[in-house]
């Protein structure tokens, strides 16, 4: 079986982490996964985007793939239309953005294409995400299913002090960690504005993006430039070490459909302050006490209070350990991959997809090997 995953661009983020996890999980089952991108980088002018989209459409058309998997709105539209015209029977789209945060034209086209039945499977990654589409046409929602993300728990390789030295971070001051692209949605500006009222804390931003210069300038203006550490995009191993090095994970996003970075931090038992969003309340729930505080994503004073309280009273180690085990079990990669294999098996049994593996049609039993 051959699958093509389609992204907007090469910029690393939670969606790329998800796709890599899916690829690694499916490969042992003799499922080949390829990846292509619509655009080489964000911020292209409209005409350049059209040219790039045309190239991606041509690649899809010529590829003769058994399944197409799209992440993000424009990729979903391309997969739905070109995949349907090409006769690819399994056209999977992931809802990685809430409708309210999607550009109006893309939102309208996505709704139209989904309502016309051009998506064969429409995946929501959380119940909160599914609820965002409650007002969409029934014909759109008919293809929706729930497959929660699954991740490998981060595996730090450095001790706390060693990791801090590795990234030139202070050894004895409280470290606040945020992981994610530097963009308006991730709302790191709020954390920088909170720093003047958190006099000992240092803020570590692990991610790249268009806001780097603006965030440095803001920190300098507020007099906290020496306590802001922007490390850029880092490989998973370095991120894992940062989870161990930091004292508190902070995640003030204005919207999330799942929150992969927050779940990763939870998997290592980090105490955290996160935005009070339905998706984050859902994915970070645990039986018993949780080392998680929620704050409104635009209330700087609430974040100052929540961060101060979390630093002053860290959770007991046993509470953090129970929390980590719960999240690891619920969002394991194995569980997610099993859900995808079940999906492919249902499609194989129903005869809706003519899969070829070395020129031979795949049976449902072969999919699970």
Listing of model-derived features with the role each one plays in the protein:
Residues 254:
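Aromatic "clamp/platform" in nucleotide-sugar-dependent glycosyltransferases that forms part
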Residues 287-301, 309-314:
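Conserved acidic donor-binding segment of nucleotide-sugar-dependent glycosyltransferases
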């Amino acid at each position: 079986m051959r699958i093509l995953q389609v992204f907007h661009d090469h910029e690393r983020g939670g969606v790329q982490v998800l796709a890599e996890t899916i690829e690694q999980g499916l490969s042992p089952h003799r499922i080949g996964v390829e990846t292509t991108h619509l655009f080489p980088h964000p911020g292209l002018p409209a005409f350049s985007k059209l040219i790039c989209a045309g190239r991606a459409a041509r690649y899809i058309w010529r590829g003769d793939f058994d399944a197409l998997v799209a992440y993000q709105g424009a990729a979903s539209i391309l997969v739905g239309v070109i995949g349907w015209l090409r006769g690819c029977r399994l056209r999977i789209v992931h809802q990685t953005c809430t409708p309210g945060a999607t550009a109006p034209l893309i939102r309208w086209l996505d709704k139209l294409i989904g309502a016309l039945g051009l998506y064969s499977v429409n995946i929501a990654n959380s119940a909160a995400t599914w609820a965002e589409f409650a007002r969409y046409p029934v014909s759109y929602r008919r293809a929706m299913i729930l497959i929660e993300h699954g991740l490998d728990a981060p595996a730090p390789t450095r001790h706390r002090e060693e990791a801090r030295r590795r990234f030139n971070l202070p050894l004895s001051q409280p470290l606040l960690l945020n992981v994610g692209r530097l963009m308006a949605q991730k709302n790191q500006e709020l954390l920088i504005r909170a720093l003047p009222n958190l006099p000992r804390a240092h803020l570590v931003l692990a991610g790249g993006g268009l806001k780097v210069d603006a965030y440095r300038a803001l920190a300098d203006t507020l007099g906290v430039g020496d306590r802001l550490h922007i490390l850029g995009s880092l490989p998973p191993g370095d991120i894992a070490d940062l989870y161990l090095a930091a004292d508190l994970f902070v995640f003030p996003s204005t919207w999330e459909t799942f929150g992969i970075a927050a779940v990763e931090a939870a998997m290592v038992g980090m105490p955290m302050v996160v935005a009070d969003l339905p998706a984050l309340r859902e994915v970070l729930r645990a039986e018993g006490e949780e080392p998680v505080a929620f704050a409104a994503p635009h209330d700087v004073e609430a974040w100052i209070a929540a961060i101060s309280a979390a630093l002053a009273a860290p959770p007991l180690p046993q509470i953090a350990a129970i929390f980590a085990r719960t999240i690891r079990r619920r969002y394991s990669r194995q569980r997610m991959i099993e859900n995808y294999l079940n999906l492919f098996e249902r499609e194989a049994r129903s005869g809706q997809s003519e899969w070829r593996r070395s020129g031979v049609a795949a049976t449902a039993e072969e999919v699970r090997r």
